[in-house]
Amino acid sequence: MEMNIFDIRSFKGSPQAEYGGAFHVSLPEIGPDLKAMGFNLMSRANNHTLDWGLEGMRETSQVLDQSGIIHARAGENLAQAGAARFLETARGRVALLSLATSFTPMSRAGDPAGEAPGRPGLNALRLAQGIVVPPEKSRA
């Protein structure tokens, strides 16, 4: 889902300086409509998750929760943002994992560190570059 859901007329947050290219937003009434159209699962980790800051992220989560839509979500810390979400159906359980490969630098969720709380945000794909040298090439 590449938008935020909140009532722009009463929203207390603001658009962010770094954003995903457009300030997509919809009114909360879209939540029940999406559910009625058959949307049961939504991925939230994308370059628009924090276009409207933490307030937009949190209000969007609230609308989806109230509408009964499961979302592999951005969360209050990395554990929440990275957690799988599950939908139980008559035919079995469906799992949803969500991560982003394109995002603004401040969008990544983080783990708590000591007394510091976790950082709210999205589940970002974290890559580590490495070079593997075969043993036969590493001999001098």
Task: Please place each PLM-identified region on the residue numbering.
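Acidic, metal/ion-coordinating pockets
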Residues: 1-140
